[in-house]
């Protein structure tokens, strides 16, 4: 009788250890990835909300100052002045002063139309914003892509009028390592 009890106990321990072993083989990263994605979602919503309001103080946490990127100077200063500032870091003070030149109202309006849930689930979302009048208008298109460690926002604005027009393209790149949103790069180009 005692041997049967011991064998039953050992069998139970064996079964429990197999169950624990199966659970140990499951990737733990899934919970971490979900946690990172939730955290990233909160940050994106906060970033977009701050952008929509045009509040540099609400989005500056996503930037490391001084920003080492001459394109910020190019987007904010006349060509002659831009040359003077090449190679100089773009500080928090300049970020406050030139915020509206770097992140124009049209960009902020279009960014507000991005669906964060769709972006994080599908890796892509697109929003458009346009205005037409009797003498011209504009059309803005913002395409946002999300990969494992990067969010790229490509903003294309086309301005047209009876006297001509032009096209501006701005690309903002953010890293998302470990679910933390941080600015990485900015590029711009203008075509007339």
Question: What positions do the PLM features span?
Answer:
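Sec-dependent signal peptide recognition
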Residues: 2-9
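Aromatic-acidic/polar surface patches that form glycan- and anion
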Residues: 8, 36, 40, 163
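Repetitive helical segments and hydrophobic/amphipathic motifs
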Residues: 11-13
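C-terminal motif of bacterial Sec signal peptides marking the signal peptidase cleavage site
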Residues: 16-17
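Short, low-complexity N-terminal intrinsically disordered segments enriched in polar/charged residues
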Residues: 22-49, 53, 61, 68
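Short solvent-exposed beta->alpha transition segments
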Residues: 41, 62-137
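Exposed beta-sheet edge and beta->alpha loop/turn motif
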Residues: 104-192
């Amino acid at each position: 009788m005692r041997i049967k009890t011991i064998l039953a106990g050992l069998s139970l321990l064996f079964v429990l250890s197999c169950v624990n072993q199966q659970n140990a083989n499951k990737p733990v990263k899934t919970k971490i990835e979900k946690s990172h994605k939730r955290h990233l979602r909160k940050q994106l919503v906060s970033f977009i909300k701050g952008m929509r309001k045009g509040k540099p103080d609400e989005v500056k946490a996503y930037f490391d100052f001084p920003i080492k990127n001459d394109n910020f100077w190019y987007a904010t200063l006349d060509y002659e002045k831009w040359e003077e500032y090449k190679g100089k870091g773009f500080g928090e003070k300049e970020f406050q002063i030139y915020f509206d030149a770097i992140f124009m109202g049209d960009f902020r309006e279009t960014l507000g139309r991005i669906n964060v849930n769709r972006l994080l689930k599908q890796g892509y979302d697109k929003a458009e914003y346009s205005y037409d009048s009797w003498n011209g208008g504009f059309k803005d298109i913002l395409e946002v892509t999300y990969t494992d460690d990067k969010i790229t926002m490509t903003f294309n604005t086309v301005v047209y009028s009876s006297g001509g027009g032009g096209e501006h393209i701005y690309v903002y790149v953010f890293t998302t390592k470990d679910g933390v949103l941080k600015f990485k790069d900015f590029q711009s180009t203008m075509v007339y």
